[in-house]
């Protein structure tokens, strides 16, 4: 396993600050179970599936939503592309949720008309005082008749998808990596939120499925993900990991902009790694703080300490060398990109 003198502990401390609490998870699961019970009563023989951050183990605090799907029997084949759309089933599901939860949540609001995919359940009752409203996104689905996956709503029609396989793939990755996959995704989701949110959460997870596959240091797995994401998105969009649709996962910004943000983030992380291994933890912390762009999660060191270490770094007697561990790193492959003292200036780099 790669060793990092100080930044791995900084990353783990930062991760703990954004990790969802057990109380939040317990309450979210309780509310999700109430919706599932209401839907099971309305649709005998149905099955439900869970997905999203709570199911995948990568939820951030504060937790404000949960996801649930219900697969409704369609033995006569009345529903599907070229047949009935999802509206009738969504209306029944919405009514069942209202009946099942109204006694506990007197201001409950359930909406589906005009929405692309989900029924939105607004509890109007935060799971903790001071938080925004808690919501649930509920997907009604039918089995794909000729193979793997489901049909899920797309406004008044249907799209093929396989959210059950998605959750199975994530669960397997968490088991294989002893939850390093989920911890890495949580950090990347927070980075994404604080830096333009150019990727949806599922794109982050899908990319991680092919590069975060063992128990490694979080700095290593984050670095592997940024490198992999840059390479893949330069070529095109991210494919569906379940391989049931040919459409790539949608980006939230032009692809060139997304790639540029990823390249900049990779450069900051590489500088943090280089400083850390060279014995300049203050400069390494500054690069990590710039990367995440959230002082509540990871605070930048004092400016005078950064300037002092910057002077020491650039002084001839303090310049990194192989003698005390500064890495000589190739530009290609999974390892950190090459960084030289001239490139590693102690100033704010690549401001988001």
Language-model features, listed with the residues they occupy:
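Terminal (often C-terminal) interaction modules
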Residues: 1-9, 240-352
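N-terminal regions immediately upstream of nucleotidyltransferase
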Residues: 1-50, 55-63, 74-88, 341-342, ...
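Conserved catalytic core of two-metal-ion nucleotidyltransferases
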Residues: 34, 86-147
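Flexible, surface-exposed loop/gating regions in the mature catalytic domains
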Residues: 69, 110-112, 118-123, 150-160, ...
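Acidic/Ser/Thr-rich, low-complexity mid-to-C-terminal regulatory regions of eukaryotic proteins
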Residues: 135-183
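A long, hydrophobic alpha-helical segment
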Residues: 168-214
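Hydrophobic, mid-to-C-terminal alpha-helical segments
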Residues: 198-239
């Amino acid at each position: 396993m790669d060793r990092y003198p100080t930044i791995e502990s900084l990353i783990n401390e930062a991760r703990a600050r954004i990790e969802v609490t057990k109380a939040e998870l317990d309450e979210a699961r309780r509310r999700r179970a109430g919706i599932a019970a209401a839907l099971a009563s309305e649709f005998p023989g149905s099955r439900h599936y869970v997905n999203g951050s709570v199911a995948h183990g990568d939820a951030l605090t504060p937790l404000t939503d949960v996801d649930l799907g219900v697969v409704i029997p369609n033995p006569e084949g009345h529903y599907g592309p070229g047949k009935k759309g999802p509206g009738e089933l969504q209306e029944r599901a919405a009514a069942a949720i209202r009946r099942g939860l109204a006694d506990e949540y007197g201001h409950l609001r359930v909406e589906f008309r005009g929405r692309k995919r989900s029924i939105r359940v607004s509890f109007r009752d935060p799971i903790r005082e001071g938080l925004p409203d808690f919501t649930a996104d509920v997907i009604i689905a039918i089995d794909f008749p000729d193979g793997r996956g489901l049909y899920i709503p797309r406004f008044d029609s249907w799209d093929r998808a396989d959210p059950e396989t998605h959750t199975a793939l994530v669960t397997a990755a968490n088991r294989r990596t002893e939850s390093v996959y989920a911890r890495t995704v949580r950090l990347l989701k927070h980075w994404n939120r604080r830096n333009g949110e150019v990727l949806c959460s599922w794109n982050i997870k899908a990319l991680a499925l092919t590069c975060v596959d063992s128990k490694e240091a979080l700095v290593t797995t984050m670095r592997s993900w940024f490198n992999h994401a840059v390479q893949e998105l330069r070529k095109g969009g991210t494919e569906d990991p379940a391989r049931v649709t040919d459409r790539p996962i949608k980006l939230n910004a032009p692809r060139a902009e997304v790639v540029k943000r990823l390249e900049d983030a990779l450069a900051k992380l590489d500088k943090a790694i280089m400083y850390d291994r060279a014995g300049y933890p203050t400069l390494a912390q500054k690069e990590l703080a710039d990367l995440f762009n959230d002082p509540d999660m990871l605070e930048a060191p004092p400016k005078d300490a950064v300037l002092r270490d910057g002077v020491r770094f650039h002084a001839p007697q303090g310049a990194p060398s192989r003698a005390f561990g500064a890495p000589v790193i190739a530009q290609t492959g999974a390892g950190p990109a090459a960084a030289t003292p001239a490139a590693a200036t102690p100033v704010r780099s690549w401001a988001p």
